[in-house]
Amino acid sequence: MNSGSLQRRLVSPDAPEAQEVHRLVSVVGDRLQDRFAEINASMNSAIEAGMDELNEPDLLDMLHASVEGNIATILHMIRNDIPLDHVQPTTAATEYADRLGQRDIPASSLRRAYHFGSDDLLAFMFEEVQGLDCSPELQLRVLHHLSGWMHKYVDWITRVVLEVHEEGRRFSAEQNATVVSAMVTKVLRGDDVSAREFATRTGYALERPHLAATLWIDRANPGSDNTAVLETVARDLAVRLGCPRPPLCTIVDRSTAWVWFAAPADHDLSSGAIHAVIETIPGLRVSLGTCQSGVDGFRASHF
C-alpha cells in the first residue's frame, strides 16, 4: 500500500469532521486502555500461535516485553494525538529485534510478528469503534483513520527494528567468524584442541573425512568485499559434492577463503561438478586438497 492511499485514510486537519474524529479516536484509545491486559494477552497469543520460530523459551519473555511496550506506545499516542515523528521505539522492542538478529532468526519473522500483532489490535479497535455513540458514517471515518494510522505506525516501527535486527545479525556473524578463525588457526598450527571443543565453537566435527579447499577471486578489486560471494560459493560446492553437512568456511581476506567440506565417501570431484559453480563467478578460482580424516587430516588436506 503506497503512502498516498494511507494518507487518504487519515482525516485531513482541514476536514469539517477532523476535530470530532480526533475526539472519538481518543475515546477509543481510553477504552482500549481499560482492556490493556486483555489486548496484551491476545496479541501475544496471536503471534505465538502463528510463528513457531519465535517460541523459544528464552525469547518469549523478550517478545512479551516488546508487545507490551508497543501497545503502551500506540495507546498513549492515539489517546493524546501525538504525531509519529515525536515518538521513540521502546527499549524492549529494539532489544528483542537485536536478540533475534544475533540468533540469526530471519528478519521476515520479525516483520510478520508486527503484522500479526497489528491485525489483532485492529480487531479490538473495530469493536470499540462499533460501540461509539455517533453516526455509522462517522464510525466508518474513525475506523479508516485508525486503520491508516496503524499502517503508518507499523511501517515506521518495522523499519526501525529491522535496522536493529541487521546490526545484531552482523555483530553476531562477525563474532562467530572471529571464534571460527581462532579455532581453525589453533588446529592448523598443531595446538592441542579437543574435537568436542572445536565442534561446539564452530559447528564442524573433526572426526569425519575432510576435503579442504582454498577459494579466491583472481585480480579482485581491493576495495570490493567478496566475503558473501565466497561463502555462497562454499555452500554451493558443498551441495555439488554431496556433502551431508554445511562446510566450515573461514575468511582470510576480502577475496580469499579457506573451506573444509564434510566429504561423503562417494564425493564427486569431476571437473564438471566444480566448473558448474566456478563459471558463475568471474575470476573465481578453487584449489582442492585431498580427502583425509581426523585432526591430522584436517591439517593435511589444507596444506
Predicted regions and their residues:
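Alpha-helical/coil-rich non-catalytic "connector" segments in signaling and regulatory proteins
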Residues: 1-182, 201, 243-245, 281
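Hydrophobic helix-rich structural segments at or within alpha/beta enzyme and signaling domains
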Residues: 174-303
